UniProtKB/Swiss-Prot annotation:
Tissue expression per record: Expressed in roots, stems, leaves and fruits. Expressed in the root cap and the root vascular tissues, in the stele of lateral roots, in the mestome sheath cells and the phloem cells of the leaf, in pollen, vascular cylinder of the anther and the veins of the lemma, palea and pistils, and in the xylem and phloem regions of large vascular bundles in node I.
Superkingdom per UniProt: Eukaryota
GO molecular function: DNA binding; DNA-binding transcription factor activity
Gene: PHR1
Region (Disordered): 1-32, 168-219, 345-428
PROSITE patterns found in the cross-reference section: HTH_MYB
UniProt protein name: Protein PHOSPHATE STARVATION RESPONSE 1
Induction: Not regulated by Pi starvation.
Residue span, HTH myb-type domain: 213-273
Taxonomic path: Eukaryota, Viridiplantae, Streptophyta, Embryophyta, Tracheophyta
Major place of residence: nucleus
Subcellular localization: Nucleus
Length: 428
């Protein structure tokens, strides 16, 4: 590539240059860097050897020493900050403006116009004291023609190579700057960029989610659409089981999206279950009242059941007592029956034993005979004892006749009476 930069216009060539004008730094520096002139020049000479030749020739023509350290030592009292330039890969010309007729302060803007797209323009100014400005304005030499020739010598292929080599570094640094750096540029940078003729495309920010949602098409739900929607929901098993995707597949309506179906399904659910919720509240109130009544009734029932259980328990105790008494009565009856049977047996035994009665009857008459004999022997007692003895004899005869009717009757004198007499005795 053997293209060279265009030469400055004639109006710029006629501008006088003073010997006290500051050196111009090479591109590739950041705008906020406050590095002195000799440091930037040393760095640029290290990175680009050809640039050092250009800078030394330019310094010689302006009256400075070739050594950057000497230049700084001789002029470090005349300025506060070093100038900076802004460059781009497609720079078309080099512009240098100098105003030496100011009093009280002198600013020299140095920059490269025509920035690339997305790379901001940076520029810094040089503040020069009054005495230096006056001395620079008074010294106008006849080296203007040589300076014009110097500009022609600089604009060659070497200068283009230097710009191309540093273009990539400046672009990478400029892309890291925030987007609002373009708004903070001075007005004269904007004017120079307009003269360069470059057009930078302005990228608009991405649309927000609100704009995207606003761009969605709204849909009016007609009664026919709602009926088909309800039919699809019922097919899927109700509003709780239905999904927007399934409803959309069943409806098959052009222009209907899943967002429309989703919103309508939510509205359908809320509208359907809202009255049910109010009814549920009233039902809950009724159920609470019913529960309270049920609790009271259940308490009454439990109390009644408890009383009934107590009564049944008492009845059971009474039945147990009655059963025990009945057992005792049965035992006593059995005991009495045994006693009665024993009495009957004893009576039958006494009746069935006649020998005991026969032995007793003859002894009694003998005793009575003895008594009669004694009475007969005692005359004093005859009158008194005679009726008694007679009665006793009669009684004895009767008992003997009853006990043994077949037995012979014995007379008072001890002789047996005949049967006829026995009958008479019995009849009497």
């Amino acid at each position: 590539m053997s293209s060279s930069l265009p030469i400055l216009p004639k109006s710029l060539k006629d501008i006088p240059r003073s010997h006290n004008t500051q050196n111009i730094l090479m591109p590739g520096q950041l705008p906020n860097d406050s590095m002195p002139l000799h440091q930037s020049a040393t760095q640029s000479s290290i990175s680009h050897p050809r640039a050092s030749v250009v800078r030394s020739s330019y310094s010689a023509m302006l009256g400075y020493a070739a050594n950057p350290i000497d230049s700084v030592s001789s002029h470090e009292g005349h300025f506060m900050a070093a100038p900076f330039i802004s460059q781009s890969s497609n720079a078309e010309m080099l512009q240098y403006l100098c105003n030496n007729n100011t009093h009280g302060g002198h600013t020299v803007p140095t920059f490269f116009p025509a920035p690339a797209c997305g790379a901001p323009d940076y520029m810094d100014t040089i503040t020069v004291p009054d005495n230096h400005t006056q001395s620079g304005s008074s010294t106008v030499t006849s080296d203007a023609a040589k300076q014009n020739e110097w500009w022609a010598d600089i604009m060659n292929d070497d200068w283009k190579d230097i710009l191309d080599a540093t273009a990539t570094d400046s672009q990478s640094k400029s892309m890291a700057q925030p987007s609002n750096s373009a708004a903070s540029q001075p007005a004269f940078n904007q004017s120079t960029s307009s003269h360069s003729g470059d057009i930078c495309p302005v990228t608009s920010p991405p649309p927000n989610n609100s704009n995207a949602s606003a761009s969605k098409q709204r849909m009016r739900w007609t009664p026919e659409l709602h009926e088909s929607f309800v039919h699809a929901v019922n097919k899927l098993g109700g509003s709780e089981k239905a999904t927007p995707k399934g409803v959309l597949k069943l409806m098959k309506v052009d222009g209907l999206t899943i967002y429309h179906v989703k919103s309508h399904l939510q509205k359908y659910r809320t509208a359907r279950y809202k009255p049910d919720l109010s009814e549920g509240k009233t039902q809950e109130g009724k159920t609470t009242d019913e529960l309270s009544l049920d609790l009271k009734a259940s308490m009454d029932l439990t109390e009644a059941l408890r009383l009934q259980m107590e009564v049944q328990k008492r009845l059971h105790e009474q039945l147990e007592i009655q059963r025990k008494l009945q057992l005792r009565i049965e035992e006593q009856g059995k005991y009495l029956q045994k006693m009665f049977e024993k009495q009957c047996k004893s009576s039958t035994q006494s009746v069935q034993d006649p020998s005991s009665g026969d032995t007793a009857t003859p002894s009694e008459p003998s005793n009575s005979v003895d008594k009669d004999s004694e009475a007969a022997l005692d005359p004093n007692r005859i009158g008194d004892n005679h009726p008694k003895n007679s009665t006793n004899v009669g009684a004895n005869l009767k008992t003997a006749a009853t006990e043994s009717p077949d037995s012979p009757v014995i007379a008072t004198d001890g002789s047996e009476l005949p049967q006829e007499k026995r009958r008479r005795v019995h009849e009497s």
